[in-house]
Every structure is written in C-alpha cells, then in structure tokens.
C-alpha cells in the first residue's frame, strides 16, 4: 500500500508540473483576476509539499491504516487534474479570449469550481495528509506554507464573480477543517468524522 501511495504522489506531482507549465503561459495576462494568478502561483507550493512527503515516506513509511491517506490523495489528485485541465484550456485560448474560455473551463472541467477553490482544496488535502504521525513532525514547514497560502487566497477577490457553484467543505480526518472559499480561514475539529456538503450564501 505504501508503494501505491508513493506512486500516486509521484503522478500527482507530475500533473501539478503540467499545470504550472500551462499557467506560465498566461501569468502576465491582466484580463484574468488576481485570484486566478494567486492560484497558479501557488501550485508550486503544493508540488513542493508533495515532493517533501514523498521523500519522508520513502524513509519512514506511514503509520496506521493506509486506506484513508490513499483515498485522500486520490481526492487531491482529482482537484489537481481539474486545475491542470482548466489552466490548459485557458493557455490554449486566443489571447484576447482567455477570460471567456476560463469561464467555460470552470463550468465544463471544474464542476463550477474556480481555480482558487480547487487549489485551496488540494492544499487542505495535503495538510490533512501531513497529519499522519510518521511524517507530521517533518512536514511542519510545508504545512505552514500551505496554511498561509490558503489564507492569502481566501482573502482575494474571486476570479469569477458569476457562474459559480456552491462552496464545498470537506474534512476527512481528525485534523483541522479549513473552510474559507471567500473569507478568512476558520477551523473546526471533527474527531474522526467525515463532513462534506455544499453551502450557498
């Protein structure tokens, strides 16, 4: 199971690198809002955290039942793929039409989720994954970077003001639930519980 997790980590990092490459194409496009660029710029933080986790797991393994961390990584990987697909669609769009292409990509490829929400979601997934006792102490620096990035993205104006889906909140373990799509980070502990839902304001 550990090798399967390492393989999933490696695959997810490669997809992140592809997303980073796509974002680089549009990083200077001022027609796209700050949160779009904030999300693209912070993909590298996620990749670095996953690379660090891969290195620590190779040396120390993981504690406890491995089904939960594997499932969590699969959920994270789905968000990474959605982000890559959205950035790719925007990067391939004509320079004068990137914003409408982004709107279409969010609807078609992101299930209504804008890139900053997808990136915040994957960051939360990685923070929860890093709670595993075998790597928790060694991942403190990366987790701190991710939590700061989550808060920064949460305080940015949304990359799209319309055609948005509701906000999704998820907590898969005993760690903090960080839920702040368009506001400051709040933390709620649910011991061993799973909370997943859609909330509209």
For the regions a protein language model found, what residue spans apply to each?
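Long, low-complexity intrinsically disordered regions enriched in small/polar
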Residues: 144-201
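Residue-identity detector for glycine
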Residues: 34, 38-40, 61-64, 110-112, ...
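N-terminal amphipathic alpha-helical segments
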Residues: 1-62
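Charged, amphipathic alpha-helical interaction modules
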Residues: 45-160
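Residue-identity detector for threonine
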Residues: 2, 11-12, 24-25, 54, ...
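Sequence-level detector for tyrosine residue identity
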Residues: 23, 101-102, 169
């Amino acid at each position: 199971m550990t090798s399967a997790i390492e393989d999933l980590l490696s695959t997810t990092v490669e997809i992140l690198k592809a997303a980073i490459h796509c974002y680089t194409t549009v990083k200077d496009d001022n027609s796209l809002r700050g949160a779009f660029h904030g999300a693209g710029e912070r993909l590298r933080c996620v990749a670095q955290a996953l690379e660090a986790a891969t290195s620590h797991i190779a040396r120390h393994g993981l504690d406890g039942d491995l089904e939960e961390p594997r499932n969590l990584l699969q959920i994270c990987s789905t968000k990474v793929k959605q982000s890559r697909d959205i950035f790719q669609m925007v990067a391939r769009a004509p320079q004068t039409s990137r914003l409408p292409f982004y709107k279409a990509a969010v609807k078609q490829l992101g299930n209504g989720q804008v890139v900053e929400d997808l990136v915040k979601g994957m960051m939360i997934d990685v923070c929860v994954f890093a709670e595993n006792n075998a790597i928790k102490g060694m991942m403190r620096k990366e987790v701190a970077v991710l939590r700061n990035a989550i808060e920064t993205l949460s305080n940015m104006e949304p990359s799209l003001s319309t055609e948005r889906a509701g906000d999704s909140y998820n907590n898969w373990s005993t760690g903090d639930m960080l839920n702040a799509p368009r506001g400051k980070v709040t933390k709620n502990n649910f011991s061993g519980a799973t909370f997943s839902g859609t909330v509209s304001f």
